[in-house]
């Protein structure tokens, strides 16, 4: 594993990635959307396919491009509109719990 890949593997927050890759960002946008930005970044990376053949310079350029795009997606839009997580893809009103199930659960003490 290259030094860049090791460093990237040690990063955990959106802010860590943005700072490491020298991408300017608005703290308010990141604070509200950090998980969405990272999920979108992951999705973009997944679409790229295998990046094992890339050297550190090419890999860093790819990460900067994809993370910048992920961040910009939430500068110009919002989490509900972008629908990054599965919960946003569920149809309105489809997920529900019947009163009967609530009553049964209450009787069982759950």
Curated annotation (Swiss-Prot):
Coiled coil: none annotated. InterPro entries: NifW. Keywords: Nitrogen fixation. GO terms for biological process: nitrogen fixation. It holds the Pfam family NifW. May protect the nitrogenase Fe-Mo protein from oxidative damage. Homotrimer; associates with NifD. Belongs to the NifW family. This is Nitrogenase-stabilizing/protective protein NifW. It comes from Acidithiobacillus ferrooxidans (strain ATCC 23270 / DSM 14882 / CIP 104768 / NCIMB 8455) (Ferrobacillus ferrooxidans (strain ATCC 23270)).
